[in-house]
Amino acid sequence: FTTGWQSQWQAALESQLLAVSPKARLISVDYGKDPKNYQAAPIKMTFRYEIPGYALSGEREMLFKPMVMNNLYNQVKSYLRINTDLEERRYGFKDACSRLVELDETIQLPTGYKLAGNGKEDSAQSSAADFEGSLRQDGNKVVLHQKLALKKRVYEAGDWNGFRNAVNAHKSFGDYIVIKR
């Protein structure tokens, strides 16, 4: 988002939201301390939005995908385009860069709804990549947390299992969430 004029940043964020749903509306955005200097340190952006009708409604239940895992900024997540269906690799592989991806989302539930099931927790560590993630209910909110560390840009074939396990664990948090009344 920092490649354009600062006056266009909000429009760029709205464009990202509209890639998820044409009903999305940006309420507010906080770009953090020094967003223009994004190469000096990790950036943190916080934005609030609403999407009327985003959840699919059934009888006494709703189904939806976490926003941060539903086509939001996918163009910069090159690791999602690496085919992790392969069980083994005979040759090294590359990603665009090493990276630390931290995704946190808090979803306000309608009155009377609860997360179906017990939530989810997963982690994976290796010399190539680490992952930790959780999905839980906290009062009337569903809280999603993910931290994916891809430690290299150029990987050896022997790094494949660690990379694959971490990325697949990350992807698994993009499954639909069911809440019930």
Task: Set out the residue ranges of the language-model regions.
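A sensor for short, sequence-defined functional sites
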Residues: 1-181
